[in-house]
Amino acid sequence: MAAKDVKFGNDARVKMLRGVNVLADAVKVTLGPKGRNVVLDKSFGAPTITKDGVSVAREIELEDKFENMGAQMVKEVASKANDAAGDGTTTATVLAQSIITEGLKAVAAGMNPMDLKRGIDKAVIAAVEELKKLSVPCSDSKAIAQVGTISANSDETVGKLIAEAMEKVGKEGVITVEEGTGLQDELDVVEGMQFDRGYLSPYFINKPETGSIELESPFILLADKKISNIREMLPVLEAVAKAGKPLLIIAEDVEGEALATLVVNTMRGIVKVAAVKAPGFGDRRKAMLQDIATLTGGTVISEEIGLELEKTTLEDLGTAKRIVINKDTTIIIDGNGEEPAIQGRVSQIRQQIEEATSDYDREKLQERVAKLAGGVAVIKVGAATEVEMKEKKARVEDALHATRAAVEEGVVAGGGVALIRAASKLSELRGVNEDQNVGIKVALRAMESPLRQIVLNCGEEPSVVANTVKAGEGNYGYNAATEEYGDMIAMGILDPTKVTRSALQYAASVAGLMITTECMVTDLPKGDAPDLGGAGGMGGMGGMGGMM
């Protein structure tokens, strides 16, 4: 086992604080509408330019191992805030730095670290309750656009785009962000259910100009099995032909004789058919077939539950207003499923989301909810260069997370005002002893730091602005973009309550751990390889000159 370097007490805390300050100072220059950019060097390709706090934090690794431990713990604050609310990473870092700096001063002055931590925790719990009281619901498009604009670093087009996407697919819909091909941002909305499976044969195509298949008011046969024998399908094909409607077959696979017969019948105009593979694999495929069945009012024909293809009737088939299939995707528009059944299915999947342990499973389940309940919107980000594209895409993703958080828990006045109002309500809060009271003061003072940093980044005097804002009431604050005072919510400067709450909670959590640190242990750096000097016994080699 390698030898360790151990530091105690003040020595450890000073080193740790130095690391905290390096990371926090790099991150906090990005805060607010007039925050600066940070350029990140990459081992290959062009450097990345960003104003995203968590992107900056992730890049920082310090040479001194004790300082690095401090930096990594604050990096954890930014990452946790990002995971929980998708934004607020810079705010969380600024809060953490302030609590740690003030807290360690108190420890150096002889306060009990555990009581300080208890005081900080007490203040944060009370502040979170105050934030909830200050919160107002965020339901209309205008408020959603404002939240998106603030989170995308005051880019109005992004805010409007997100609001439009949410309006079209609903709050349950899936909104994804992709790199576009042009200079302009675009919004593509897919209404209905779309899945990534295209036609099994190009001979089914009935719209050659677009290379797609369009079926109006079709029947939909859902089979959880491979279909290779046409005989078992004859009864249902005859019934569909009599009804004079097209048929879409969604099965594990359609192959061989069955596929050939369907193609021939389609080309002769006897019955209009198209076939696609069912989406997903294994259990996920079964679940998605059941989703499609619920959406279209059909039944999944599965031998596991005793249903056979030969005995399938028109009552077992689903229906929809229209279906569009191309070589990669199938879209079912306006399925004729019953609304209570669809809502029941959505509730069932939501329950699974609550219980899901992996992010991947959760994401797939959320996609299924969106396909049943709303739709899918794709924001295609446009930019002139790849460097700008990456930076803009990261901003749009942040803004999207922030707007979701706003819809979930409401909004509070932005620009650091909500934290100042929450802190002012807690001036009478007391702990059980003097050390806890100091902890409470540390937390309340830290809650001013985001506003102070925003003001500092726009070149004004933080103390003057902070005192003016504290003298005001309600949503009265400082708009750093226009350098004016006024009602923050009326000016459209909003922060999602969830973002502000998460930033404060995670900052206090990690800061509390660091204040109560008394010892730090790290590996000693490995020494250089020992110097072997002149290798013994080789001296006689000198006489080999005559070999030439």
From Swiss-Prot:
Keywords: ATP-binding, Chaperone, Cytoplasm, Isomerase, Nucleotide-binding. Signal peptide: none annotated. Its EC number is 5.6.1.7. It catalyses: ATP + H2O + a folded polypeptide = ADP + phosphate + an unfolded polypeptide. It comes from the Bacteria. HAMAP family: CH60. This is Chaperonin GroEL. The lineage of its organism: Bacteria, Pseudomonadati, Pseudomonadota, Gammaproteobacteria, Enterobacterales. The gene is groEL.
